[in-house]
């Protein structure tokens, strides 16, 4: 079968020291996971100038690409996707893993249309041997290093999918809740065809509405 291959040059690793730790931590997380709704990790090969990471290939692309054609109008399809996302998330949390950057970019579809969570670059393992990273490699809208919440802690996640607990710095003991909020935002986007908080023009306005004004994204009229 086909495999997806990520290629990383050693030059990139040496110029960005955090990247090596980030990749190492992500591989540790992915090695733990085996579930129909999680992209499967096959292994890594280290060559002279490059590192190759092998993962399950998802022919259907991302949920983002699907939503470029508009909302998911068929309610049965939406229900199936929502149940698959919930199954995948329930499994992650049962393994003590919090994804921390759930959004349509990080949800893929295989050739059968089965939902798969991907990109564990921001994931955290809730255990004594905690591993965490600061950013998702593929997230252009991910907060830049240095962004902080109301408690002065580093923020992780993409603002429009970010839970109130994250903005207010109240995630201690409620880590799973942030993924559930983000997943709710994704399902809402599938139903509406527009991103949560799409009417706001910048990330700080979004975070104010989520954390300070205690507002939720608008629900569909129908």
Each PLM stretch: what is its role?
Residues 147, 166-177:
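Conserved end of the kinase activation segment
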Residues 43-44:
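A short, aromatic-enriched beta-strand patch in the conserved N-lobe beta-sheet
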Residues 1-12:
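Glycine-rich ATP phosphate-binding loop
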Residues 49-62, 66:
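Conserved short submotifs of the Hanks-type protein kinase catalytic core
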Residues 81-82:
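Activation segment signature within eukaryotic-like protein kinase domains
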């Amino acid at each position: 079968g086909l495999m997806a291959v990520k290629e990383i040059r050693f030059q990139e690793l040496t110029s960005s020291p955090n990247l090596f730790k980030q990749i190492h931590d992500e591989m540790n997380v992915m090695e733990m996971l085996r579930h129909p709704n999680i992209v499967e990790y096959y292994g890594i090969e280290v060559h002279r100038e490059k590192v190759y990471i092998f993962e399950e290939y998802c022919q259907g692309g991302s949920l983002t690409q699907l939503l470029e054609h508009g909302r998911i109008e068929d309610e049965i399809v939406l229900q199936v996707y929502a149940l698959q996302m919930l199954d995948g998330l329930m499994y992650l949390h049962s393994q003590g893993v919090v994804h921390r950057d759930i959004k349509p970019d990080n949800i893929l579809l295989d050739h059968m249309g089965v939902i798969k969570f991907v990109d564990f670059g921001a994931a955290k393992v809730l255990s004594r041997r905690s591993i965490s990273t600061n950013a998702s490699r593929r997230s252009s809208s991910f907060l830049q290093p240095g962004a902080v919440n109301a408690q002065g802690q580093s923020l992780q996640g993409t603002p429009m999918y970010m839970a109130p607990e994250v903005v207010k710095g109240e995630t201690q003991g409620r880590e799973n809740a942030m993924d559930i909020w983000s997943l709710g935002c994704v399902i809402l986007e599938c139903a509406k065809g527009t991103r949560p908080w799409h009417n706001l023009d910048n990330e700080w306005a979004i975070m104010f509405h989520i954390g300070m004004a205690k507002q939720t994204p608008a629900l569909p009229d129908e």
